[in-house]
Amino acid sequence: KKYNAIVLRIEPDIESDDKVYRDIVTNLGYKIKDNAKDFKDEIQPRYVFRLDIKGKTEEEIMAGFHQKWRYNIRLAAKKGVEVREGTREDLKAFHKIMVETGSRDGFIIRPLEYFEKMYDNLAPEHMKLLMAYYDNEPISGVIPIFYGNKTWYLYGASSNKHRNLMPNY
């Protein structure tokens, strides 16, 4: 009420069916939204998958991927897709690709200003922008965020151009 807020959304790194968590949250008067049918119902996904890479080599990590993922990763590298760390200025290109992705896949896109504020507040310690290029043209991007010893793939975007190069892998 103090800030005229309508909704407070929290997404703790806790299993959603954790009884202790659910009891605490509901006893505090909050509601738990479990009814999102798919990604199109939300602006951010409700569930995440986790991959423990601690102490593993790149080869061991790759071996844990589905065969088709390994193929696509190697194909992108072989075809000349290059991944570079982006700057705040590269957010415009990322956002343009994100709009293209949202239009193609039917999900809501946050405005450029959201990504700029996120970058200003989190980069470089807790956020990166990684962009994939083909012939120096940005064709894909990802925003991972870091906290403690964990990384979350928060946003990803891929252009309709050069999709056959598998830049999002």
Q: Which stretches of residues belong to each language-model region?
A:
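Extracellular disulfide-rich cysteine clusters
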Residues: 19-22
